[in-house]
Amino acid sequence: MAHPHLLAERISRLSSSLEKGLYERSHAIRLCLLAALSGESVFLLGPPGIAKSLIARRLKFAFQNARAFEYLMTRFSTPEEVFGPLSIQALKDEGRYERLTSGYLPEAEIVFLDEIWKAGPAILNTLLTAINERQFRNGAHVEKIPMRLLVAASNELPEADSSLEALYDRMLIRLWLDKVQDKANFRSMLTSQQDENDNPVPDALQVTDEEYERWQKEIGEITLPDHVFELIFMLRQQLDKLPDAPYVSDRRWKKAIRLLQASAFFSGRSAVAPVDLILLKDCLWYDAQSLNLIQQQIDVLMTGHAWQQQGMLTRLGAIVQRHLQLQQQQSDKTALTVIRLGGIFSRRQQYQLPVNVTASTLTLLLQKPLKLHDMEVVHISFERSALEQWLSKGGEIRGKLNGIGFAQKLNLEVDSAQHLVVRDVSLQGSTLALPGSSAEGLPGEIKQQLEELESDWRKQHALFSEQQKCLFIPGDWLGRIEASLQDVGAQIRQAQQC
């Protein structure tokens, strides 16, 4: 076997050659190439005139000396037009019912069938055997067929509960194509003088028969790690719970796994990675509704679970909660304690500030943030004279929230431990403390847990960075995963700064 990274580079260059002159079809070309390299079938859905047939023709050039067959189905198409005419000579001389297959589907490596759903039962039945078993019954003989890629196309989906569903289920990759959208690409397409039938692939990049056969065995040796299987099973269970989810047969799941193995193999890896699971978005949908649903579920899987994003956030939440508990346990020791004055028999208890509190403006920290006057508040600034008067005589007390703006009216009280407590509208309280009176920095227990969590985050991010070099995965998906990991990292760093 060639060095894995050299193989990945070669396949990338091969795909780039196949994509030349085709605008906004890179993803379709890459998945069709992956299907061809792993012996799978593709269904292209889209309106006429959007290069569906050209995609199939291009794939012929991926292989040395590959033969191609393409046919436009109609309601009147006959098996002879697809599988070859009967041999009159064999029937006349020997009474054998045998087809002349040269130039037809049974002898082609690349097959393109347009308007596939218009095929009649006789064609469909033979086609199913060809896809499933790579065999063709020609008279009394069963012949192996060399088909590496079947591309079927239509501008519509098969009717539900029709005889076409069996064939549709064999189309592992399903791609929904549209017209060229980008203005610059549209202009380039209109003015391009490239002959679409020219071979754009250098001979050195084309796949030989020996390489193709060897790769089929090596694809099967790619491992499926336990954590990747758990992600697949999680997706399957989630789909089973949704009432509108499409039915996905066990056969389709099994074929999809081989596609994931091929993606890993041609990306230079020895095992399927979570990033390969994004390919399932093009394998599991049935119609427009299920296409959106499948993409949503895989997006949740990729941005929430594939690199332990949700698990790390859950751990972070537990660490933050523990930090709050420790802060609350320390509140009695760190809180500002006022001095109770005499006057037991007076109507209102009087207090005064400690003698060491002498600043004209006092900034008091909330042991836990509160939402006051529609603002998340972490500290309050008081005029010392106003606070002294309130402690002595009661009445209204005002302070600047987070030290800014006008002084706002506050619900402030002295608790039984002689601590100042501010309350929000729901009467949730937070003890006030002088700056520097609270514990310095994070507790050792919390600091260690956050460092371990950050280390795990770095490992997951490094894994993703290594795995994202995958030709067959669109860049926008990789961008969303990167953003989800960066969000987790930012929350961890924020917690470390508290």
UniProtKB/Swiss-Prot annotation:
Residues 1-306 are annotated as: AAA+ module. Residues 331-437 are annotated as: LARA. ATPase activity is stimulated by ViaA. ATPase activity is also stimulated by interaction with the inducible lysine decarboxylase CadA/LdcI at low pH. The complex formed with CadA/LdcI represents a possible means of regulating RavA activity in response to acid stress conditions. CadA/LdcI may stabilize RavA oligomers under acid stress conditions. InterPro entries: AAA+_ATPase, ATPase_RavA, ATPase_RavA_C, MoxR, P-loop_NTPase, RavA-like_AAA_lid, RavA_ATPases, RavA_LARA_dom. Belongs to the RavA family. It is a peripheral membrane protein. It catalyses: ATP + H2O = ADP + phosphate + H(+). Its EC number is 3.6.1.-. GO terms for molecular function: ATP binding; ATP hydrolysis activity; identical protein binding. Gene3D superfamilies: 1.20.58.1510, 2.40.128.430, P-loop containing nucleotide triphosphate hydrolases (3.40.50.300). A protomer can be divided into three domains: the N-terminal domain is the AAA+ module, which is composed of two subdomains, the alpha-beta-alpha subdomain and the all-alpha subdomain. The second domain is a discontinuous triple-helical domain. The third domain, named the LARA domain, contains a compact antiparallel beta-barrel-like domain forming a unique fold. Binding between ViaA and the triple-helical bundle domain of RavA results in the enhancement of the ATPase activity of RavA. The LARA domain mediates RavA-CadA/LdcI interactions. It comes from Escherichia coli (strain K12). Homohexamer. Interacts with ViaA. Interacts with specific subunits of the NADH-quinone oxidoreductase complex (NDH-1 or Nuo complex), particularly with NuoA and NuoF under aerobic conditions, and with the fused NuoCD under anaerobic conditions. Interacts strongly with the inducible lysine decarboxylase CadA/LdcI, forming a large cage-like structure composed of two CadA/LdcI decamers and five RavA hexamers. Does not interact with the constitutive lysine decarboxylase LdcC. Interactions with ViaA or CadA/LdcI and phosphatidylglycerol are mutually exclusive. Pfam families: AAA_lid_8, ATPase_RavA_C, bpMoxR, LARA_dom. Keywords: ATP-binding, Cell inner membrane, Cell membrane, Chaperone, Cytoplasm, Hydrolase, Membrane, Nucleotide-binding. HAMAP family: ATPase_RavA (MF_01625). It is found in: Cytoplasm; Cell inner membrane. This is Regulatory ATPase RavA. GO terms for cellular component: cytoplasm; cytosol.
